[in-house]
């Protein structure tokens, strides 16, 4: 309020100064200007126009002013006096203005200081509140930021661990992939080599196939020719068989005569030389049996026209006993794929697998008429036999040709041995009636004829592997042409036993 009154008082003084110290400017159409110089500052006031005499209004103003002087007398030197008077008034006004200014400055200082202090206090309180709020918010945000940072660190740790695991897995996978790539490269190389070899083999096979095809055609031509020749030979054989029957009868009669003569000679020898008879008591196992030895086992016999005695196995149990074993198979421990000389003189052990020998069989069957019995057993334990009432073989010049008559038994209604005669063949002596060499193809030594329905000296096969074996121990009319038997025994006994 004090400041407002001071400004009002200042405005009144300025108005009075404007009326007292005014002048017109001829350039501005009669406007009045009042200029005041105070120190370095100059103040110019533009006063409005008045119709009346300014003196009266000035006088009225002076009447209300506490600092006024007596009006000067109007004289000839009125203008200079008036100017002096105005200057004096201006000095007074200037002093008043300075006082007012000082007063205002002093009051304004205290009031401004108070206002500033209040403003500072209010502002400080507000700032404190704001600061407190900011501190609390900052603390909360710091806590949240710490939590977020912790979560980020945890997540980062998990991601780093997972990344490490993934890196290890990737390394392992890369290592495995590299190994597999190397293996694939090796396989490709092997495949290339195999493909090259296959191509070479295909070329060779093609050449061989062409060769085989040509050979097959040649064989077909040859078979056709052989078939025709065989048919012709069969016709000749039938004619020869008819002629041979008469010869066989004559031969049998001669053999009976020879046997009778041998018996007479034997009796004469027994009567004349007792000690010598003791050294050669048995011609075969029938003599052993008749001498009172009825247990199966190995005995020594003395065969006519043989320089030394021979150990043989005598079967005293089957069908009355007295059987001389000439062949036995049971376990495959002995190889029967042998040559002509071995089959001639025999091989093996009489107590196990063995072949008596073609020369001894010929010598025995030349003494008297003999019966042949063949005991068979398959891999399932089934037994059968074939028996021939007349059996003998020719000498070596006749290739130990087989002669049989009167087949009976349980090993098939038909005989698996050739009844009309067949020569003995081995791997080094091909005497069969086939171009294929049966002894090499079917193995062993046997009376093959044209690779006929039997071969008891073939390869031995164990149970489970004995089916589909053309080169096994076979007896066609007992188990078929490709079934290999487990056990066989060939034995002979005199017909008149």
Curated annotation (Swiss-Prot):
Residues forming coiled coils: 158-256
Annotated signal peptide: 1-19
One cellular-component annotation, GO: extracellular space
Chief location bin: secreted
Record-linked Pfam families: ANG-1, Fibrinogen_C
Fibrinogen C-terminal domain ranges (all copies): 276-496
GO MF terms, alphabetically ordered: receptor tyrosine kinase binding
GO biological process: angiogenesis; blood coagulation; cell differentiation; Tie signaling pathway
InterPro entries: FIB_ANG-like, Fibrinogen-like_C, Fibrinogen_a/b/g_C_1, Fibrinogen_a/b/g_C_dom, Fibrinogen_CS
Keywords assigned by UniProt, alphabetized: Angiogenesis, Coiled coil, Developmental protein, Differentiation, Disulfide bond, Glycoprotein, Secreted, Signal
Record keyword rRNA-binding present: no
Chloroplast keyword on record: no
Glycosylation-annotated residues: 92, 122, 154, 243, 294
CDD domains: FReD (cd00087)
Alphabetical list of NCBIfam families matching this protein: GGGWT_bact
Function in brief: Binds and activates TIE2 receptor by inducing its tyrosine phosphorylation. Implicated in endothelial developmental processes later and distinct from that of VEGF. Appears to play a crucial role in mediating reciprocal interactions between the endothelium and surrounding matrix and mesenchyme. Mediates blood vessel maturation/stability. It may play an important role in the heart early development.
Binding partners and assembly: Homooligomer. Interacts with TEK/TIE2. Interacts with SVEP1/polydom. Interacts with THBD; this interaction significantly inhibits the generation of activated PC and TAFIa/CPB2 by the thrombin/thrombomodulin complex.
Protein name: Angiopoietin-1
Organism name: Canis lupus familiaris
Encoding gene (name): ANGPT1
């Amino acid at each position: 309020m004090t400041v407002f009154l001071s400004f009002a008082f200042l405005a009144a003084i300025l108005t009075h100064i404007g009326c007292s110290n005014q002048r017109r400017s001829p350039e501005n159409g009669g406007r009045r200007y009042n200029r005041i110089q105070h120190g370095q500052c100059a103040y110019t006031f533009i006063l409005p126009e008045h119709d009346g005499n300014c003196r009266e209004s000035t006088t009225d103003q002076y009447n209300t002013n506490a600092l006024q002087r007596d009006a000067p007398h109007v004289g000839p030197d009125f203008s200079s006096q008036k100017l002096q008077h105005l200057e004096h008034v201006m000095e007074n006004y200037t002093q008043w203005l300075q006082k007012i200014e000082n007063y205002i400055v002093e009051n304004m200082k205290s009031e401004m200081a108070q206002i500033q202090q209040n403003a500072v206090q209010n502002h400080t309180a507000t700032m404190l509140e704001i600061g407190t709020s900011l501190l609390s918010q900052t603390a909360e945000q710091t806590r949240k930021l710490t939590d977020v940072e912790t979560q980020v660190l945890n997540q980062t740790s998990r991601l780093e661990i997972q990344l490490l695991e993934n890196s290890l897995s990737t390394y392992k996978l890369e290592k495995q992939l590299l190994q597999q790539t190397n293996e694939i490269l090796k396989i490709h190389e092997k495949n290339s080599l195999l493909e090259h070899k296959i191509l070479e083999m295909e070329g060779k096979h093609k050449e061989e196939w062409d060769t085989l095809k040509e050979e097959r055609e040649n064989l077909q031509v040859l078979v056709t020719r052989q078939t025709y020749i065989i048919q012709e030979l069969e016709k000749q054989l039938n004619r020869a068989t008819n002629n041979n029957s008469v010869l066989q009868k004559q031969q049998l009669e001669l053999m009976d005569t020879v046997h009778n003569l041998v018996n007479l000679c034997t009796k004469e020898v027994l009567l004349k030389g007792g000690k010598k008879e003791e050294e050669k008591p048995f011609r075969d196992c029938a003599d052993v049996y008749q001498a009172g030895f009825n247990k199966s086992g190995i005995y020594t016999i003395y065969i006519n026209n043989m320089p030394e005695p021979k150990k043989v196995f005598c079967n005293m149990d089957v069908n009355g006993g007295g059987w001389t074993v000439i062949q036995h198979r049971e376990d495959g421990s002995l190889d029967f794929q042998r040559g002509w000389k071995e089959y001639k003189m025999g091989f093996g052990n009489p107590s196990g697998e063995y072949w008596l020998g073609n020369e001894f069989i010929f010598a025995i069957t030349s003494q008297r008429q003999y019966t042949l019995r063949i005991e068979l057993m398959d891999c399932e334990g089934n037994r059968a036999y074939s028996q021939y009432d007349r059996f003998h073989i020719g000498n070596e010049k006749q290739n130990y040709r087989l002669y049989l008559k009167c087949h009976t038994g349980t090993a098939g209604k038909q005989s698996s041995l050739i009844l009309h005669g067949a020569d003995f063949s081995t791997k080094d002596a091909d005497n069969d009636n086939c171009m294929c060499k049966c002894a090499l193809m079917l193995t062993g030594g046997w009376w093959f004829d044209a690779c006929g329905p039997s071969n008891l000296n073939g390869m031995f096969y164990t149970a489970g592997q004995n089916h589909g074996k053309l080169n096994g121990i076979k007896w066609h009319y007992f188990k078929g042409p490709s079934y290999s038997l487990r056990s066989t025994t060939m034995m002979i006994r005199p017909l008149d036993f």
